[in-house]
């Protein structure tokens, strides 16, 4: 997760340090976390007989294009891009979040040759139009849908707490509905369902 890596690096920044030292520490944390993930891919390839699909959760296209290349070199058979971000800016420009998906995909496709899969959220006004544009820009497949972290409040302690971590079976109907709609209109791209699959019947 891009935000987790960046948050940990920022957390270790100390204003009392020299700026160069603080930047070095942040860069070390980032590189260490990414190296751990690349090693996981390499080890998985040694023991798995099925394709290994790597996944990165990001919301910018700055450094993740380079990381995608490293993932390919580590042996991943495909790469899933999960662009998960809560849009709450009052100055938000309509359509800019959809365009960010297309821009990140386009940049990554120029760097790697393995298939790129885009995982989408369920809060788009018109997922079909976005899927069509993703296919036009080289996406091999889409996954519907990703899921926001669900915060909650403990009313007894009046503290923030985590909400339900897992999906529930009722989530599947929305996913299947949109896969049905989208696949009938944009049929040349592959689809995968995510969330709400709790028993064999869902598969």
Across the structure, where does each feature detected by a protein language model lie?
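Short glycine/proline- and acidic residue-enriched helix-loop micro-motifs
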Residues: 19-28
């Amino acid at each position: 997760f891009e935000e987790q890596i960046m948050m940990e690096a920022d957390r270790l920044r100390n204003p009392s340090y020299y700026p160069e030292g603080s930047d070095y520490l942040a860069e070390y944390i980032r590189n260490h976390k990414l190296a751990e993930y690349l090693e996981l891919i390499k080890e998985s390839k040694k023991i798995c007989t099925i394709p290994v699909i790597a996944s990165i959760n990001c919301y910018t296209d700055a450094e993740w294009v380079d990381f995608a290349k490293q993932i390919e070199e580590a042996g991943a058979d495909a790469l899933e891009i999960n662009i998960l971000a809560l849009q709450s800016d009052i100055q938000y420009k309509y359509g800019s979040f959809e365009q960010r998906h297309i821009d990140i995909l386009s940049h990554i496709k120029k760097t790697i040759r393995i298939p790129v899969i885009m995982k989408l959220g369920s809060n788009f006004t018109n997922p079909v139009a976005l899927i069509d544009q993703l296919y036009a820009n080289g996406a091999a497949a889409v996954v519907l849908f990703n899921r926001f972290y669900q915060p909650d409040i403990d009313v007894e302690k009046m503290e923030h707490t985590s909400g339900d971590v897992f999906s529930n079976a009722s989530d599947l109907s929305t996913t299947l509905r949109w896969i049905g709609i989208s696949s009938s209109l944009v049929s040349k791209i592959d689809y995968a369902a995510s969330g709400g699959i709790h028993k064999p019947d869902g598969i």
